[in-house]
């Protein structure tokens, strides 16, 4: 086995972060990426760390678990966080990025790093020539997926997720929508398409009866809740969407609103939110409207939304299969394979769900691969931190019921002592403890 470099397979968010962290520690990296030679069903470019679903890194507040995770990653010099900050677009209290500018920045930095050799091509075998980080993502090629599944006795898990449509802003009827963030948090960053009860019921009927694109007959539908197709959500009940992406709470009509409304109500019956998708502000995505409807049906149904009667869809929603591993049985908390300590895994394939979480797992795997290379012991981040709670969750949960997981305060170790009843105060206390513990851990 070579002790002159480390392999990183896959240049998505996790692989890009892992490669950066390894090279930062003075170790040569061979970074393999098949895009540019072979396409995936979902990616649009050959850029590293491409965002294929939303352009949002979600909430930025420390009272939000993903906001805490991002702050921890900033303190660990995350390339994904740094590039994201440099290419932010308005999103109220959330962190959203210009997906093209951000991905190009990550790609350029890694390609120009003298310690990183970028190799474009498909890897079909698990390498055994050097310490290796596999971060090929939920869209892992079939050939390599077979080898990874063999580690689990041939048992593979999978689920479907979907991407939301993107709209040309110039085709939105601005007379029927209004600019506002929920509860007026941060700047008014979302375009809101309000619906009356009558409009919502007609929309719900059209959505639940629209024709979906076919699935392969051998693949069972198994959705991750965080990226569920809107039509699947709608079929769960007439009001399900009203507690999800079409929730109207905190999105009151502006004083000068002259469109239709239900009586004297100050809040619409339902709201579809559109979020800026690029730095120029010319594209908007439909928040929470991941879908697997046929493209013609998407146009017909979504043009029923007030303000979108003549909307031009620059990208229709699509759905794809996402594979993930039996991490509780296959991985250590360091993201090392239980069967081979020279093999690391990172990203959504490990069962962490979300852009930020994927990058965080790559950060941990990259640090530990570098430590192993140098003959040092792999580290386990404190379970009191967000970045420590994720690897603990995916490697310690019940394998029989293992599902992909976003970071949340429920998986971070509880505070000691008397429970703080106020949720905001409790989350603030957890965040304060997490950052203190991370600092102490890094200085130990």
Curated annotation (Swiss-Prot):
UniProt-annotated location(s): Cytoplasm
Enzyme Commission number(s): 2.1.1.74
Catalytic activities: uridine(54) in tRNA + (6R)-5,10-methylene-5,6,7,8-tetrahydrofolate + NADH + H(+) = 5-methyluridine(54) in tRNA + (6S)-5,6,7,8-tetrahydrofolate + NAD(+); uridine(54) in tRNA + (6R)-5,10-methylene-5,6,7,8-tetrahydrofolate + NADPH + H(+) = 5-methyluridine(54) in tRNA + (6S)-5,6,7,8-tetrahydrofolate + NADP(+)
Keyword Thylakoid listed: no
Cofactor(s) needed for function: FAD
Signal sequence region: none
One Pfam short name: GIDA
Single annotated GO MF: tRNA (uracil(54)-C5)-methyltransferase activity, 5,10-methylenetetrahydrofolate-dependent
Top-tier EC class: transferase
Function: Catalyzes the folate-dependent formation of 5-methyl-uridine at position 54 (M-5-U54) in all tRNAs.
Entries under HAMAP family matching the protein: TrmFO
PANTHER family from the UniProt entry: GLUCOSE INHIBITED DIVISION PROTEIN A, METHYLENETETRAHYDROFOLATE--TRNA-(URACIL-5-)-METHYLTRANSFERASE TRMFO
Family named by the database record: Belongs to the MnmG family. TrmFO subfamily.
Protein name (Swiss-Prot/TrEMBL): Methylenetetrahydrofolate--tRNA-(uracil-5-)-methyltransferase TrmFO
């Amino acid at each position: 086995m070579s002790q002159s470099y480390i392999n990183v397979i896959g240049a998505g968010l996790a692989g890009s972060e892992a490669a950066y962290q390894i090279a930062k520690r003075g170790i040569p990296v061979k970074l393999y990426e098949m895009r540019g030679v072979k396409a995936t069903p979902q990616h649009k470019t050959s850029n590293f760390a491409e965002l294929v679903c939303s352009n949002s890194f979600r909430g930025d507040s420390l009272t939000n678990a993903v906001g805490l995770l991002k702050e921890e990653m900033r303190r660990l010099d995350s390339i994904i966080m740094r590039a994201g900050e440099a290419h932010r677009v308005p999103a109220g209290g959330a962190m959203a990025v210009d997906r093209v500018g951000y991905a190009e920045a990550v790609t350029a930095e890694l390609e120009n790093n003298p310690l990183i050799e970028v190799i474009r091509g498909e890897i079909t075998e698990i390498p055994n020539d050097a310490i290796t980080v596999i971060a090929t993502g939920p869209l892992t090629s079939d050939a390599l997926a077979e080898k990874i599944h063999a580690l689990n006795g041939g048992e593979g898990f999978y689920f479907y997720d979907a991407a939301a449509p993107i709209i040309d802003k110039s085709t939105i009827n601005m007379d029927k929508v209004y600019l506002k963030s929920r509860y007026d948090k941060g700047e008014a960053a979302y375009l809101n398409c309000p619906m009356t009860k009558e409009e919502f019921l007609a929309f719900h009927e059209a959505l639940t009866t629209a024709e979906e694109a076919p699935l392969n007959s051998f693949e069972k539908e198994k959705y991750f809740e965080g990226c569920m197709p809107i039509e699947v959500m709608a079929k769960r009940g007439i009001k399900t969407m009203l507690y999800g992406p079409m929730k109207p709470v905190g999105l009151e009509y502006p004083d000068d609103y002259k469109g239709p409304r239900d009586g004297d109500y100050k809040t619409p019956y339902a709201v579809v939110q559109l979020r800026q998708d690029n730095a120029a502000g010319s594209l908007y995505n439909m928040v929470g409207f991941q879908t697997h409807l046929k493209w013609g049906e998407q146009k017909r149904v979504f043009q029923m939304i007030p303000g979108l009667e003549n909307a031009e869809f620059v990208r229709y929603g699509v759905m794809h299969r996402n594979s993930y591993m039996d991490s509780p049985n296959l991985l250590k908390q360091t993201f090392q394979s239980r069967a081979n300590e020279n093999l690391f895994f990172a990203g959504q394939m490990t069962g962490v769900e979300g852009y930020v979480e994927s990058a965080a797992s790559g950060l941990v795997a990259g640090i530990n691969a570098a430590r192993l290379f140098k003959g040092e012991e792999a580290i386990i981040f404190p379970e009191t931190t967000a970045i420590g709670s994720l690897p603990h969750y995916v490697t310690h949960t019940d394998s029989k019921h293992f599902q992909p997981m976003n970071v949340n305060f429920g998986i971070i170790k509880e505070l000691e002592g008397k429970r703080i009843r106020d949720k905001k105060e409790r989350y603030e206390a957890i965040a304060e403890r997490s950052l203190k513990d991370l600092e102490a851990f890094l200085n130990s």
